[in-house]
């Protein structure tokens, strides 16, 4: 899925976490096409490096907004991430995950996450983590205009001895 991702590029963000377990945050990151030594748009035909600026129509942009609720034994969150002009931060690839979408495609991703842990460790009951992402690609053909991914994780703590951890995903 494309909903979550990391970036060390230029950006700005904010978060609000009151003391009641709720949290909301939003951030925007942008990647200038300064590294495009190519003749493709927006670099032009000379193949020269061009600085496209911050938050311009030509810069790659990711805008993510997340809301969540956390308590000591459980948590749930949802994120919406709108990526434009070819922003990419995918970590896996089995062919072209964007199908036949243009390289400068826009996409909208939604991600859902939740976890729960038992009151006591050292039992047969594991903690559980769940996640689901779905992405819609604006310029892909109708047969390849969405993708989705999910995960399920189980984790046992202190089962055989203190501080041991066993996990399956």
Name these PLM-found stretches:
Residues 1, 25-29, 77-81, 129-133, ...:
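Transmembrane beta-strands of outer-membrane beta-barrel proteins
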Residues 1-62, 96-97:
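Surface-exposed coil loops of outer-membrane beta-barrel proteins
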Residues 10, 18-24, 63, 72-76, ...:
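Outer-envelope beta-barrel architecture signal
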Residues 23-27, 113-134:
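Surface-exposed extracellular loop regions of Gram-negative outer-membrane beta-barrel proteins
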Residues 28-32, 71-73, 80-86, 132-138, ...:
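Transmembrane beta-strands of outer-membrane beta-barrel pores
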């Amino acid at each position: 899925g494309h909903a979550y991702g990391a970036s060390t590029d230029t950006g700005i963000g904010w978060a609000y976490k009151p003391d009641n377990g709720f949290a909301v945050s939003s951030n925007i990151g942008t990647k200038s096409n300064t590294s495009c030594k190519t003749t493709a748009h927006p670099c032009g035909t000379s193949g020269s490096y061009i600085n496209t600026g911050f938050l311009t129509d030509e810069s790659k942009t990711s805008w993510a907004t997340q809301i969540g609720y956390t308590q000591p034994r459980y948590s749930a969150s949802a994120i919406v991430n709108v990526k434009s002009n070819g922003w990419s931060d995918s970590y896996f690839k089995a062919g072209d995950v964007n199908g036949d979408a243009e390289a400068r495609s826009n996409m909208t991703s939604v991600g859902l996450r939740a976890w729960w842990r038992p009151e006591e460790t050292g039992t047969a009951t594991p903690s559980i983590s769940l996640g689901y992402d779905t992405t819609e690609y604006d310029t892909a053909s109708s047969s390849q205009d969405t993708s989705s991914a999910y995960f399920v994780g189980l984790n046992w703590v202190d089962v055989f001895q203190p501080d041991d951890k066993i996990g399956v995903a």
